[in-house]
Design a protein with these regions (language model features):
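Active-site-adjacent "subsite" loops/lids of carbohydrate-active enzymes
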Residues: 5-73
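Generic structural signal for hydrophobic
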Residues: 1, 62, 69-70, 189, ...
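Conserved, mostly hydrophobic/aromatic
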Residues: 6, 62, 69, 78-81, ...
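A structural motif
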Residues: 74-75, 192
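Active-site beta-loop-alpha junctions enriched in small/polar residues
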Residues: 11-15, 82-85, 172-176, 200-202
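Aromatic-lined substrate-binding rim segments of carbohydrate-active enzymes
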Residues: 1-18, 24-29, 140-164
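Aromatic- and acidic-residue-enriched segments that line the glycan-binding/catalytic groove
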Residues: 14-44, 83-130, 187
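Glycoside hydrolase catalytic-domain groove-lining segments
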Residues: 108-230
Length: 230
């Protein structure tokens, strides 16, 4: 009657359900210190528990959640949020309030170094990322994480489309900041009808005009990626 659409909001890699954490602790991401985010509270946030995108079973779990949501009567679409890694670096305007110093990438917040990620990367490049002298300087290791997250996002979004629903995702502010801060290469997320960049400029210590700058960067990145979905 009023043109209102119903879209389900789905937390994607960020899954806090106790039954899931207890049943499959191996699904959760591990930092460069060997600590699982299932066991530690990142940024003192209880909900910061993140599934690893390298594991096929985590993607299948998320696909099943999509199929469940798609059964909701009157549902128009499904919106993927938290389709990323934990913040390796928080947006700059939040450092003081969260009590962190992040002048570089620190092992505590650098994910994922679980057995599956290490195994798959070694198959591709012949080295365990744990053995890299400086993982942050290894372009192949960065690209691996961007790619596996993009594949998970694309595969989950494909199921949304198969269910006949509109697919969308919340993404970080600009493509480069997103890749740097949360390992999210959203310009290469396929099968999405819409992306909604979270251009919270004050989080980045930016003035209002940066909203336009970040928007333009996003449009240009999508064009450069030749992403047919958007």
């Amino acid at each position: 009657k009023y043109g209102v659409e119903l879209h389900a909001w789905m937390w994607t890699t960020n899954r806090v359900e106790k039954h899931l954490r207890d049943a499959h602790p191996e699904w959760y991401q591990v930092n460069a210190q060997g600590e699982s985010c299932n066991d530690i509270k990142l940024y003192n946030r209880e909900h910061y528990r993140w599934l690893c995108p390298s594991r096929p079973e985590t993607t299948e779990y998320l696909k099943d959640r999509v199929r469940e949501l798609a059964e909701i009567d009157g549902l128009t679409g499904i919106h993927l949020d938290f389709i990323r890694y934990p913040d390796v670096i928080l947006p700059y305007g939040l450092h003081e309030s969260r009590g962190v110093v992040q002048d570089k990438v620190y092992p505590l917040w650098d994910f994922c170094y679980c057995e599956k990620c290490r195994e798959e990367f070694k198959k591709l490049h012949g080295i365990d990322p744990m053995d890299l002298e400086d993982p942050t300087a290894c372009q192949e290791w960065m690209q691996y994480r961007w790619d596996v997250m993009a594949k998970m996002a694309s595969d989950v979004a494909a199921v949304i489309k198969e269910c006949g629903k509109v697919s969308s995702a919340a993404v970080f502010a600009s493509p480069e900041e997103s890749k740097k801060l949360v390992r999210q290469d959203w310009a290469n997320f396929k099968n999405l009808d819409y992306v909604f960049p979270m251009i919270y400029h004050k989080f980045y210590d930016k003035d209002d005009p940066w909203v336009e700058t970040a928007t333009r960067e996003g449009v240009e990145a999508l064009a450069a990626a030749d992403n047919p979905a958007l």
